[in-house]
Amino acid sequence: MKLKRGKPKEKFSYDPQKVLKKLEDLAYKILEEVKAGKNPYFDVPTRGLSNVYFDEEARLIKLGDKLSRRYFLNVAHARKFMQTLILMAYVKRLVSEGKHASLREAYYANKHTIPGTHENTFEDQSESDPIIEDLERMLGVLREEMHITADRRGYVYGDIVIKDGEDEFNASKLGMGGWAVPGTVEHIQFPEINVDYVLVVETAAMADRLIEEKYPKRERALIIATQGQASRGVRRLIHRLHYEEGLPIIVFTDGDPYGWYIYSTIKQGSINLAYLSEKLATPDAKFVGMTMDDIKEYGLEHVTEKLKGIPPDKKGGPTGDYKRLIEELNYPWFQNKEWQRQLKLALKWGVRIEQQALANKSLEFVAKEYLPEKIREGKLLP
Amino acid sequence: MAEARDLFKEFKVQSVSEFFRRNAAMLGYTGSIRSLTTVIHEAVTNSLDACEEAGILPYVRVEIEELGKEHYKVIVEDNGPGIPEDYIPHVFGKMLAGTKAHRNIQSRGQQGIGISGAVMFAQITSGKATRVITSTGDDEIVEAWVKIDVQKNEGKIVKKIKHPNPKRWRGTRIELEVKNVKYVRSKQGVYWYLKLTAIANPHAHIELVEPDGKLIVFPRSSEDIPEPPVEMKPHPKGVMTDDVYTMAHRSKRSTVRRFLVSEFSRISDKKVDELVLYIAALRLINREVTDQNLKSQLIERLANGEVEKVLKSFGRKWKKVVEEVEKIMEKPPEKLTWHEAEEIVEAFKLMKFLAPPTYGLRPIGEENIEKGLSSILRPEFVTAVTRPPKVYSGGIPFQVEVGIAYGGEITNSEILRYANRVPLLFDAGSCVITSAVRSIDWRRYRVESFDNAPLVVLVNVVSVHVPYTSTGKQSIASIDEIYNEIRLALMEAARRLAAYLGGKYRRLYQIRRKKIFEKYLPEIARSLHILTGEPEEKIKEYFLRLIESKITVAQEGVSEVEVEEGEA
């Protein structure tokens, strides 16, 4: 199987005016309600598992249509109502001035004592973060589109040209460290793409290995290191590279419940950010490894490690890895025979296998044999 | 029976004054704090009663001066009718001479000892005579020093001066010098006693000057002078041998029969005939029957009304005995012996009578309780319940009233106990009022914890014969009828309190809500201004109008449409 760049399904869509309009429309709605003597409210899509479902057709974790109304004239809501408006005003300033702020900056910028009281607008960052999430869900825009950035994590290496504001550069000519993915990738554009697919790698160590082995150049691949759970920026970048640039996405993680969960999040989205799945998730992503079958296939039995936690048949179990395995067995998007097989084998054997375990063969084994072979032969999991 | 008579004679011979000396404790003169309170009580009661009878709105001023260690001068002055010169030794000197002794009347006085007891106490502790200054409002003021002749049970004026009264002052001022007493501002002290008295007598203006010169005023809050209590003829079920004996000897009726019919309630000629049969039957039983079982069986039959059958069971001699007893009824009442009085009371216990009349009871009244509690305690809520009169022990009328005061300047919980308007300061633990108040589940009435609530509960038990637990007359016995009446009254008052608290909390809640919304307005207005460009002041105005229209802080309650609260 030869991986090729396909046709784009989405267009570069970043438009600050759109966000501003949404903010102002909502603010006018509130103002009009008050003028009319009505108790003004925000309709906030409900957070949490109860309002999340798996859309089989789109193959995405999606937010349900449950709303909770946040009224001004409600003792339990009034403070949050105020906080919502404060952050809306803040976002308006950020976007119109073209500035970005981190979640923490957004918190500090808006924390002050309410005039005439001893009460602060925000007592803690744990008060402002959820309001920003609420705004994302209410307005249907990403935090990043509101110029509020998340933690940055992950980097990119490969032969593509990235346009970040004034700067334009090739991501294979920035040294071995590649290009660090910023908190916000909305405004990033890709004037030139000379790769056939994206390989998403869980650990930085493995990404570094592949870069050193010149894998990106030889295989015409773009390496994205997630460095653990993929950050929102990375997930959004993967999504955009797939849908806007037509690049196939292949994920390479450790062979353990945590690695598979990283894959699941990239592919289907997460429960916490279900409202963003359509912008963050990439259901077309495929999984290359590590799998339980790899252990037998490549003779890695002696470099496996035991799963952490208590197995389900032991007293107090299941906990740790076992618990997560059983959860994953029940995920709707893992209801296929390939994944059920991997998960059940892991449960049966009680072992995990790390990406780095492939170094047991030789340092270049992963770059020259394992990945090229599996990808060429299409030994990928859905 | 001759023995009993002799005993009583002996008792009569003993001077009541001496009796006082020996029984000072029983009369309330026990302990240094309580003794002082009792002195004040007797003097103030005298003043209030005198004003009541004369239809005067009372003004009572109490002054206490410290002369030395446990040595005080007590001054009580009133604007009452004054005492005519001739009566001074009588009023202050003779014990059991008070106008109410041996009258079946609801009274403040406790033992019929009254003010003479205070004079006596002063005399035996300090040796000093009591100084009385009084005028009936005519052209002279009498100043007299009164002592009690302990042997003769008589008051005597040891010194007397007359002064002109150009301003027509009217009233009485008495000054007593007492030792072995102590002024303390405690729950048993004078201050507390007067405060409680003021609550139960809102028509009185009461002042207290404490030893350190501090003036405390309990102002009048009602202009209604209570009607003086009416004497009620005693009910046969409510009398003891002593009552019957004493009443008979004072009676001016020609025969015992006439005495019984006219001086008791619910006794008719027919009832006297019945009484004769009962006494005869009792005589026969006591004389002829030795077997205790049989005796009590027969007495039980008497109580069931089978008096004629019981009599006939003794054969023909019963008629003779009845004739004997009938003779008692026809003799002059002053000839009635102690034993015969005893027989009459014994028979009364077994006979059936109509319940006694209750018209003589004088409760404080709901309105006046509320006034008293309001003006002295300054609560935010007050209510009172006066129950209809009831009867206990088959023949003694009584009436219960309660008042509840909540919040305001009240800081802790308190039970104010009264018997016939007189505060009961001692023996709270054994009192039926305490147990009845404690038996209420106050949480059902929105009072989380009675002990920690700003709640004052007043209970007044009104009766001709308040059943005290002991001679100290400071706590009321646990009689079921009284206990139940107190509870019923308390529950009714507590329901009103609960309704008030419900509304109060709702109002407080609404005010708090309003404040919450209002405090966020500056932030909201600023933010909406940034978002929409509408001037901040205008936005604030819109929101304020909204708050005003949606949240009404009114007595009637809430007009706000409470919205469903979603997950927040």
From Swiss-Prot, chain A:
Keywords: ATP-binding, DNA-binding, Isomerase, Magnesium, Metal-binding, Nucleotide-binding, Topoisomerase. It is an enzyme of class 5 (isomerase). The keyword Magnesium applies. Its EC number is 5.6.2.2. It catalyses: ATP-dependent breakage, passage and rejoining of double-stranded DNA. One of its GO terms (cellular component) is chromosome. The keyword Lipid biosynthesis does not apply. GO terms for biological process: DNA topological change. Mg(2+) binds at residues 202, 254. HAMAP family: Top6A. Homodimer. Heterotetramer of two Top6A and two Top6B chains. Belongs to the TOP6A family. This is Type 2 DNA topoisomerase 6 subunit A. It comes from Pyrococcus furiosus (strain ATCC 43587 / DSM 3638 / JCM 8422 / Vc1). The lineage of its organism: Archaea, Methanobacteriati, Methanobacteriota, Thermococci, Thermococcales.
Curated annotation (Swiss-Prot), chain B:
It holds the Pfam family Topo-VIb_trans. GO terms for molecular function: ATP binding; DNA binding; DNA topoisomerase type II (double strand cut, ATP-hydrolyzing) activity. Its EC number is 5.6.2.2. It catalyses: ATP-dependent breakage, passage and rejoining of double-stranded DNA. ATP binds at residues 46, 78, 99-100, 109-116, 473. Keywords: ATP-binding, DNA-binding, Isomerase, Nucleotide-binding, Topoisomerase. It comes from the Archaea. SMART domains: HATPase_c. GO terms for biological process: DNA topological change. InterPro entries: HATPase_C_sf (IPR036890), Ribosomal_Su5_D2-typ_SF (IPR020568), Ribsml_uS5_D2-typ_fold_subgr (IPR014721), TopoVI_B (IPR005734), TopoVI_B_transducer (IPR015320). Homodimer. Heterotetramer of two Top6A and two Top6B chains. NCBIfam families: PRK04184.1 (NF003218), top6b (TIGR01052). Belongs to the TOP6B family. PANTHER family: DNA TOPOISOMERASE 6 SUBUNIT B. Relaxes both positive and negative superturns and exhibits a strong decatenase activity. This is Type 2 DNA topoisomerase 6 subunit B. It comes from Pyrococcus furiosus (strain ATCC 43587 / DSM 3638 / JCM 8422 / Vc1). The lineage of its organism: Archaea, Methanobacteriati, Methanobacteriota, Thermococci, Thermococcales.
